[in-house]
Regions:
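Nucleotide/pyrophosphate-binding catalytic subdomain
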Residues: 1-237
Length: 237
């Protein structure tokens, strides 16, 4: 899912201009999603985007409408390069700084609305137990880890307390070691463990296109698998 751009000045022709009509049209969707659990994954490109502050405001609005939000942020993409000790320390510092910035933006409430300066509770914690990746092809992966366990009860307790749960792609081992994790894997395990109703991933990736270069607006799981197979076959030709 790509980041939204600033809204156009003129509303679409089919958008109701009467506030009452607009509310009547949106009320069924608000009612349908109230109380649902949604995991929102923020890839590195999303958090660095100029429009990110508007994304946070949209998430705050979703929360105010009764959606239980778990926000996972990726502090940096994991590449194939071996992580050095200096790079690991820098990665941890970046992750903690990014978490602080996201908490700061949520603390603003919803600007230009009755919820401006309203207190939105954001909860972070040691929700993820991790284990080391270990040695691959004779190379020690140092601070890279894998998800071992998710504290589902702790996250549910935060959500039931009307908090937004903010999860950094870091994990701790029972021995107190700290590991950096694959954010996509964290999103997947969280969504499955919580039985989330939706998983939304926001990034700077443009999406999946068909053979003619047209963007798929909607895909079932089977259609997505077929699209990936077709893409792989085309690359081999």
């Amino acid at each position: 899912m790509t980041l939204p751009t600033d809204p156009p000045t003129d509303p679409p022709a089919d958008l109701p201009t009467d506030p009452i009509d607009w509310f009547r049209n949106t009320a069924p969707y608000i009612n349908a999603h109230r109380g649902t659990t949604v995991v929102v994954g923020l890839r590195h490109g999303a958090t660095e985007h100029d429009n990110f502050i508007n994304v946070v405001h949209d998430l705050a609005l979703m929360h105010s409408l009764g959606v239980q939000l778990i926000v996972v942020h990726e502090h940096e993409p994991l590449d194939a390069a071996v992580m050095t000790s200096d790079a690991f320390r820098s990665s941890i510092a970046h992750a903690l700084d990014q978490r602080t910035q996201i908490e700061r933006l949520f603390s603003m409430g919803l600007p230009n609305s009755p919820l401006h300066n309203a207190r939105l509770r954001v909860v972070s914690g040691n929700f993820i137990t991790a284990r080391p990746v270990g040695v691959i092809d004779g190379v020690d992966q140092l601070g890279r880890g894998l998800v071992r366990h998710i504290d589902v009860a702790g996250i549910r307790h935060a959500l039931e307390g009307s908090a937004i749960c903010l999860v950094t792609s870091l994990g701790h081992s029972p021995a107190g070691e700290l590991f950096t994790l694959d954010a996509i894997e964290v999103m997947r395990v969280l969504s499955r463990g919580l039985g989330a109703d939706k998983l939304i991933v926001m990034s700077d990736f443009d999406g999946i296109e068909d053979a003619d270069g047209q963007l798929f607006r909607q895909l079932t799981v089977d259609a997505a698998r077929n699209a990936l197979v077709t893409s792989a076959q085309q690359q081999q030709q």
